[in-house]
Amino acid sequence: MYMDLTLGGALLQVEEATEEEEEEEEEEQALGQEPAPAAAAAALVLGRRHGVVVGGGGGGVVVAAEREHMFDKVVTPSDVGKLNRLVVPKQHAERFFPAAAAGTQLCFEDRAGTPWRFRYSYWGSSQSYVMTKGWSRFVRAARLSAGDTVSFSRAADGRYFIDYRHCHRHGGRDISFASAATAMPAAAWPLFGRVQTAAPVSYGGGHGSAAAATMFLDTVAPVAAAGGHRGEVGPSGQRSFRLFGVNVECGGDVDAAAEEEDADDDVDDGDHRRGEEMELVMWTNHR
């Protein structure tokens, strides 16, 4: 039951927002208001901020009053969406604005002195204070997006003022591997190749001004055959083989030692055979 009531209230709010947006478009076409010139708007803003007398557009005189900053609101996607409403924080609404009775309207002046009227209501379903009718027109005029800040202030005579500022949005930044390569140490020890310096390579739209070090690794041919490491005999008769990119040579002393070991093995084998023959003769005589 509670979910059905909540859904019904949400649908009703969407319908009201659509109707109010259509009414605002009709009012805009009927009024045909145009923004004030930039110079006049700037002069009017300075006059209102500093309390000086500024000439009006029709020859009148506007006396600016001191303002009291009330609060700021960072608008959310729903505040600038199609719901046509701005949620006012409860503590600020109850402190600065009058009671949200049926048909209550709040009038604000922007930085150019243009009046803006918003319907001010209290939604019991969500227990929130909102500005509805007129808000979407202000969003379009100020080109508000999620993350922008809306500022509210008031004067001693009871007038309300509204202002805004856009947040700084950073465009998408392409990743440049050239800038990342610049941060690499210049003298790295190559294990299986050599290090060369090349022009910076940029993947995307990065702007790399400094030269970047790019590493090229030379591939090394296999140094081991099926039975082990491949050995080579140099012109001096010394044996050599390649291990991890390094030529390892075996000196003549190693070969001589190997030959001596082979000779010792041959002598031991001959002594062993003669001993076996003598044992066989002695065993035959004993029989």
Swiss-Prot record:
<dbReference type="GO" id="GO:0003700">
    <property type="term" value="F:DNA-binding transcription factor activity"/>
</dbReference>
<feature type="DNA-binding region" description="TF-B3">
    <location>
        <begin position="71"/>
        <end position="168"/>
    </location>
</feature>
<protein>
    <recommendedName>
        <fullName>Putative B3 domain-containing protein Os08g0157700</fullName>
    </recommendedName>
</protein>
<feature type="region of interest" description="Disordered">
    <location>
        <begin position="17"/>
        <end position="36"/>
    </location>
</feature>
<dbReference type="Pfam" id="PF02362">
    <property type="entry name" value="B3"/>
</dbReference>
<feature type="compositionally biased region" description="Acidic residues">
    <location>
        <begin position="17"/>
        <end position="29"/>
    </location>
</feature>
<keyword id="KW-0804">Transcription</keyword>
<dbReference type="GO" id="GO:0005634">
    <property type="term" value="C:nucleus"/>
</dbReference>
<keyword id="KW-0238">DNA-binding</keyword>
<keyword id="KW-0805">Transcription regulation</keyword>
<dbReference type="InterPro" id="IPR044800">
    <property type="entry name" value="LEC2-like"/>
</dbReference>
<dbReference type="GO" id="GO:0003677">
    <property type="term" value="F:DNA binding"/>
</dbReference>
<keyword id="KW-0539">Nucleus</keyword>
<dbReference type="InterPro" id="IPR015300">
    <property type="entry name" value="DNA-bd_pseudobarrel_sf"/>
</dbReference>
<dbReference type="InterPro" id="IPR003340">
    <property type="entry name" value="B3_DNA-bd"/>
</dbReference>
